[in-house]
């Protein structure tokens, strides 16, 4: 049975966010690097570093928190894996769902790489819906 690396990074980020940890370490693959770059560009994470340990590469993510008077509160509210190895979900560009009326993002795997729902609509291409973030 193969590993679902997308589900692993979503679970790692969600668990660290719920436990209010600022740093998350995940395994580095091409897919995880592309997803992390989208999260960085959209402002859900603050910083990314590539770390090498025993000939294996890891990504070290710094989560973004907003501060108020009492304590820091979370920036990422929810992450949800949609298409999984046992049930793939595909969509054309016209039927890509809008999360919270456009406030959240959908990450898609397309023929032109991994991108957000806004980028896919602008380019007029659909693909596999990987996850929702809102």
UniProtKB/Swiss-Prot annotation:
Q: Which GO terms describe its cellular component?
A: chloroplast; ribonucleoprotein complex; ribosome
Q: Which UniProt keywords apply?
A: Chloroplast, Plastid, Ribonucleoprotein, Ribosomal protein, RNA-binding, rRNA-binding
Subcellular location(s): the record lists: Plastid, Chloroplast
Annotated family: Belongs to the universal ribosomal protein uS8 family.
Q: Which residues form the signal peptide?
A: none
**Annotated PANTHER family:** 40S RIBOSOMAL PROTEIN S15A
The keyword Chloroplast is annotated on this UniProt entry: yes
Record flagged with keyword Ribosomal protein: yes
**What quaternary arrangement does the UniProt entry report?**
Part of the 30S ribosomal subunit.
Membrane-spanning segments: none
By its UniProt entry, which InterPro entries does this protein fall under? Ribosomal_uS8, Ribosomal_uS8_CS, Ribosomal_uS8_sf
GO MF entries: rRNA binding; structural constituent of ribosome
Q: Name the encoding gene, please.
A: rps8
Q: What is this protein called?
A: Small ribosomal subunit protein uS8c
HAMAP family, A to Z: Ribosomal_uS8_B
Which Pfam families does the entry link to? Ribosomal_S8
The processes (GO biological process) annotated in the record are:
translation
Free-text function comment from the UniProt entry = One of the primary rRNA binding proteins, it binds directly to 16S rRNA central domain where it helps coordinate assembly of the platform of the 30S subunit.
Q: From which organism does this entry originate? A: Nicotiana tomentosiformis
